[in-house]
């Protein structure tokens, strides 16, 4: 109360006492809606390939990123707030906001690192023909909007579904999610199905 009354007593506009909103951490490389629409139009529409031969082990993930940190730990630090890490780079305190569902967590064990385009989905849309090095780069991509910290059970509910079958619980995140999905598919020249494209068009319409 004192903080709000003081500006009034001093004749200072109240707006000066209100701090600017804090920007939440976001993955890098998210395109504008217009760019995402252009990239979506450029993607090849094709029937989804087979899951035959797929294994997560074919996408070496959570590799070392220098020092004692692996990819998962780098994303936890990037996407968290006030993160404190131990000597092995594991977060011992801090918080994480999950944009998929709007939940905030204070234990790293409650957070998964989501592959925005799941590894199995990538396999079925072109990654089955990649080299192991290419699949490793995809699974640990810190440049494109492919990795983000989210609520663990929400990520598990998503599984390897595309946007035609799974969308973030928060409809307000549809736009951003679609932009990220399109950018990753475009960056890696992965195909999309007709149902997937229709879902993405609808989600981009919310932007």
Model-predicted regions and their roles:
Residues 1-23:
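Fungal secretory targeting signals
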Residues 13, 64-65, 147, 177:
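Generic detector of short, well-ordered, non-transmembrane alpha-helical segments enriched
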Residues 22-30:
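An acidic, glycine-rich, mixed-charge low-complexity segment common to nucleic-acid enzymes
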Residues 29-102:
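Aromatic-lined ligand-binding clefts that engage carbohydrates, nucleic acids, or primary amines
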Residues 96-207:
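Domain-level detector of nuclease and nuclease-like folds
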């Amino acid at each position: 109360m004192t903080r709000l009354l003081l500006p009034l007593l001093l004749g200072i506009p109240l707006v000066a006492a209100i701090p600017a909103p804090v920007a939440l951490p976001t993955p890098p490389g998210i395109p504008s809606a217009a760019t995402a629409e252009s990239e979506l139009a450029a993607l090849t529409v094709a029937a989804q390939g087979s899951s035959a031969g797929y294994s997560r082990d074919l996408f070496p993930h959570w590799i070392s990123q220098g020092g004692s940190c692996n990819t998962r730990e780098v994303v936890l630090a990037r996407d968290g707030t006030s993160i404190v890490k131990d000597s092995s780079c594991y977060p011992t305190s801090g918080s994480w906001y999950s944009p998929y569902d709007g939940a905030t967590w204070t234990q790293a064990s409650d957070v998964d690192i989501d592959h925005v385009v799941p590894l199995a989905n990538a396999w079925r849309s072109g990654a089955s023909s990649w080299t192991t090095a290419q699949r490793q780069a995809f699974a640990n991509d810190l440049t494109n909007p492919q990795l983000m910290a989210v609520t663990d059970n929400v990520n598990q509910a998503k599984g390897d579904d595309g946007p035609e079958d799974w969308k973030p619980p928060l409809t307000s995140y549809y736009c951003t999610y679609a932009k990220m999905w399109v950018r990753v598919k475009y960056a890696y020249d992965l195909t999309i199905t007709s149902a997937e494209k229709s879902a993405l068009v609808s989600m981009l319409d919310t932007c």
